[in-house]
């Protein structure tokens, strides 16, 4: 599951490498449609989901890997973050993986006109709590098309439930 992956090319790359049972969720139907058009017939191989991640219901579907590059840090209120984590607990298979990318401790305070929450690995792990075993983390600078650098924190966990 690629959270916020609307116009991302991650799904293209995974399909090209032979991965199956892929899913993408984005709040923007236009972003999903853009990627479906880009993928053409290959789009039929992907499960597409449009909606707000804090209110989404995947039903009985379970995922081996949950990937979020830059959605979670937009959840600035505790209730939204709790709803997100509860959904991850429901949707990721036991012993599955969660890969998160958020703005790091020195990252921007807002993005696209919206406030964000910055994280270090301990704070992010605290948000997820028991049941998530931290396997590693890394700080990296992302060079934006605008010519600036944004600090990102990448964390990967294994669901231990």
Predicted region positions:
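Conserved acidic residues
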Residues: 64
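Class I (Rossmann-like) S-adenosyl-L-methionine-dependent methyltransferase catalytic domain
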Residues: 1-61, 75-91, 96-161
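A conserved beta-strand element that flanks and buttresses the S-adenosyl-L-methionine
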Residues: 67
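Short catalytic micro-motifs in class I SAM-dependent methyltransferases
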Residues: 70-74
